[in-house]
């Protein structure tokens, strides 16, 4: 168990804002025992228990698509110094076998997800809030590339979800919290140097924040 409450960082951004690379870069600034990451994506309710829309495309971009209680419970457990276990979410990809994820407590806890600011009980736990943003067309092109390669979606499916699920959810559940965040990261380039520099700066600040005071 950790001796003291961890420093909790919330990271959120629109689809295609570069969260995955940002998170990898950020976490890599720390040793494994220094940081823990818990992601909202691993708390999706299985699609076969949701209500399909008329065109049979599921809407994953709603707060009700997440097992909110389990997400909050596991964050609390990590803050109390306990490990948590969760089956990986595979985005309904039948070619992927989900693995069991173990998250162990650490001095820095990163909470990531679209709704982490909207869920009041989770937002209250955060010591720092980081908002990632990319221009809409840039974000859409990134989403198209990812969903073709990783999830086997057609362009028609991706564009439908973008216009009817992704952007409405972003505008309603995330964008209103942008100005309340401690740091807004604009990520309109695919040059990794920008994100590497920003994550280096933030990690340095965090080390200072969690350093025991004499």
Give the ranges of each region predicted by the language model.
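ATP-dependent NMP and nucleoside kinases share a basic, alpha-helical "lid"
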Residues: 97-149
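NTP-dependent small-molecule kinase module
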Residues: 2, 104-105, 145-148, 167-214
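The conserved Walker
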Residues: 15
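Conserved lysine of the Walker
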Residues: 19
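Hydrophobic positions on the alpha1 helix immediately C-terminal to the Walker A/P-loop
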Residues: 22
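Conserved nucleotide-sensing/catalytic segment adjacent to the nucleotide-binding pocket
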Residues: 36, 45, 49-93
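Post-Walker A helix-loop "phosphate-sensing" segment adjacent to the P-loop in P-loop NTPases
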Residues: 28-36
């Amino acid at each position: 168990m950790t001796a003291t409450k961890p420093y909790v960082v919330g990271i959120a951004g629109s689809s295609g804002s570069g969260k995955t690379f940002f998170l990898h870069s950020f976490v890599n600034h720390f040793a494994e025992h220094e940081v823990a990451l818990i992601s909202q994506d691993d708390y999706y309710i299985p699609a076969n228990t949701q209500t399909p829309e008329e065109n049979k495309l599921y809407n994953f971009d709603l707060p009700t698509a997440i097992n909110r209680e389990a997400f909050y419970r596991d964050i609390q457990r990590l803050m109390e110094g306990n490990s948590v276990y969760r089956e990986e979410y595979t985005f309904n990809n039948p070619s992927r076998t989900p693995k069991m994820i173990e998250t162990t407590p650490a001095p820095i806890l990163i909470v990531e997800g679209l709704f982490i600011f909207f869920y009041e009980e989770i937002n209250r736990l955060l010591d720092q809030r980081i908002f990632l943003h990319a221009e809409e067309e840039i974000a859409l092109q990134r989403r198209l590339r990812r969903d073709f390669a990783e999830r086997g979606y057609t362009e028609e499916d991706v564009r439908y979800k973008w216009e009817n699920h992704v952007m409405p959810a972003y505008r309603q559940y995330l964008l209103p919290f942008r100005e309340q965040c401690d740091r807004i990261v604009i990520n309109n380039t695919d040059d990794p140097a920008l994100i590497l520099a920003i994550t280096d700066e933030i990690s340095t600040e965090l080390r200072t924040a969690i350093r025991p005071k004499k």
